[in-house]
Curated annotation (Swiss-Prot):
Binding of heme, residues: C470
Source organism (scientific name): Cordyceps militaris (strain CM01) (Caterpillar fungus)
One Gene Ontology cellular component annotation held by this UniProt entry: membrane
Gene that encodes it: milC
Protein name: Cytochrome P450 monooxygenase milC
Main localization, broad class: membrane
Lineage, opening ranks: Eukaryota, Fungi, Dikarya, Ascomycota, Pezizomycotina
Length: 526
């Protein structure tokens, strides 16, 4: 009996301590909210617990969820930051520059990656800069970023001569399409293969020749011909990865053997590059070469293996470089070409700008990085494409401590908002970039000239912002500008169906044109 009484006393004490702690936490939160003048957010009403009806709507929707579900809910609520009535810890959804600045920059230490990010994408991307926590000294994110920073600071990474063979292969394939009478064939798979070859050349020690592998199915292909290895892996992984991201804590519902096999394709390729780099690192140095020559021969992967022996981290970094480098550039180039095809005058203007900088009539040797930066219209084409079609249109963070957002509360949305620890926040550059109050009444139109005299701010986040801004941003912009310039050198015209309004898009791991890239690139001799 005494033992039972002791158990009851211990249990009651533990419960009392728990209740007391929760009461102290609640009191501290109320005080923080009161001291900061916080008021509640607008609340969207879900019909089922945990927002199950909303999650089901997202999973089963066959249209464009960004336009049909996400943008429309902002419009229905009449604000650009809100929460919902989900049980437990309701999320915050926003498309507000001030909120994004706070989360990504000024209150960076109060927020971390969404706790569902790693389990959702870990089977594919592993750890590293895209999915790891940035909290704590010596965090995995900081380690991975420190390994990558000197490589992206190296001017050799931006050497156009490295990527020119891949670009020449792409131009040759476009010539084959024209000769075969298929000038308006969907170019999306060819653009992705181009970027596979570029990224593997620059970062992995050599192209895997994805374009050559895909040449057999480029013109008059046998429908049964197997896709190139990375293309097949991408096509298998991305739809499932997109669902795993969009459904939050229910990511585990979406998996399959093809998905796991696709993930193994990426890790297998990365392991092969690492093994070759390690073998080269362990070779005895050639004393007949001076140190400068030896250093110049090191590729990106060889530099990585000289900085760490953590094979798992090395593999994850390479896989993430493949994903981020290939998909981001593919998304941008695809949308840019479709918009240029819909606006023939813009293509003519681009060619005229290149001619004015003595880059039109010559070959690749006439195109320099410095001159590309001086081509204002070319740079504005890229900016405007990334505004209307950001590759990652929705992202997320999670509050790791009680914090306050600068605005969004109260009837007019001008008051601060208290955010308890554990709150998930989803933010949409896609919606923000299309706001008429930020970009004018023509916000839904592709207009590169809107960037004349306008500098990007926190209302423009195609590459994120703050300490976690995309480390490969400069490379993506540089290589994309070079490819567009080479295409403009080669082809007199770029045409697509003359439709109006934004291009219909499809969301997987990144945003791509739903109908592909049915663009015709031709010249007067074709």
């Amino acid at each position: 009996m005494a033992i039972h009484a002791a158990y009851i006393f211990i249990a009651a004490t533990l419960i009392a301590l728990y209740v007391a702690r929760r009461m102290r936490e609640q009191h501290a939160r109320q005080k923080l909210a009161r001291d900061q003048g916080c008021e509640p957010l607008t609340t969207a009403i879900n019909k089922l617990p945990y927002g199950l009806d909303r999650k089901w709507q997202i999973v089963t929707h066959r249209g464009n969820i960004l336009d049909d579900l996400i943008t429309t809910r902002f419009a229905e609520l009449g604000c650009y930051i809100y929460t919902d009535n989900q049980w437990g810890s309701p999320p915050i959804i926003c498309a507000e520059p001030a909120t994004m600045k706070a989360v990504l920059s000024t209150k960076f230490r109060d927020w971390d990656m969404d706790s569902n990010r790693y389990p959702a994408l870990g089977p594919w991307l592993g750890r590293g800069v895209l999915v790891s926590s940035h909290q704590g000294k010596g965090s995995l994110w900081a380690t991975a970023r420190a390994l990558l920073r000197p490589m992206f600071a190296n001017t050799a990474t931006y050497n156009h001569a490295l990527i020119e063979p891949s670009v020449q292969e792409f131009l040759s394939i476009l010539g084959h399409l024209n000769q075969a009478g298929a000038p308006d064939k969907d170019l999306l798979p060819f653009i992705r293969r181009l970027n596979v070859d570029i990224i593997t050349t620059v970062f992995c020690g050599g192209s895997i020749n994805e374009q050559q592998s895909g040449l057999a199915i480029a013109v008059g292909a046998d429908a049964k011909h197997r896709k190139p290895v990375l293309e097949e892996a991408f096509d298998t992984i991305e739809p499932i990865a997109g669902l795993r991201l969009q459904t939050g804590s229910m990511y585990w519902l979406f998996t399959s053997k093809p998905f796991r096999d696709g993930c193994e394709t990426f890790t297998g390729l990365a392991d092969g590059w690492i093994n070759r780099a390690l073998s080269k690192r362990d070779e005895k140095p050639d004393l007949s070469q001076d140190e400068g020559a030896a250093a110049r021969e090191k590729n990106f992967t060889e530099e990585l293996v000289s900085s760490t022996d953590d094979r798992e981290l090395l593999r994850d970094i390479l896989v993430q470089l493949l994903f981020a480098g290939i998909d981001t550039s593919t998304s941008m180039l695809s949308f840019a070409l479709v918009e240029l095809g819909r606006h023939p005058s813009a293509w003519a203007r681009l060619r005229a700008e290149l001619a004015a900088h003595n880059m039109l009539s010559g070959g690749p040797e006439t195109i320099t990085a410095a001159q590309l930066k001086e081509c204002a219209f070319l740079q504005n084409i890229i900016k405007e494409t990334l505004r209307l079609y950001p590759p990652v249109p929705i992202n997320s963070r999670e509050a790791i401590r009680d914090t306050v957002l600068p605005s969004g509360g109260g009837a007019d949305g001008s008051k601060p908002v208290f955010v308890p620890k554990g709150t998930s926040l989803k933010y949409s550059p896609y919606v923000m970039h299309r706001r008429e109050d930020l970009y004018g009444p023509d916000a839904l139109l592709w207009n590169p000239d809107r960037w004349i005299g306008r500098a990007p701010g926190w209302d423009y986040l195609p590459f994120n912002g703050g300490p976690r801004v995309c480390i490969g941003q400069k490379f993506a912009l540089s290589s994309s500008a070079y490819v567009l310039a080479r295409l403009a050198q080669q082809f007199d015209t770029c045409t697509a169906l003359p439709t109006t309004g934004p291009i219909d898009s499809k969301l997987g791991a990144v945003l791509v044109p739903k109908a592909g890239v049915p663009v015709s690139l031709t010249n007067s001799t074709t």
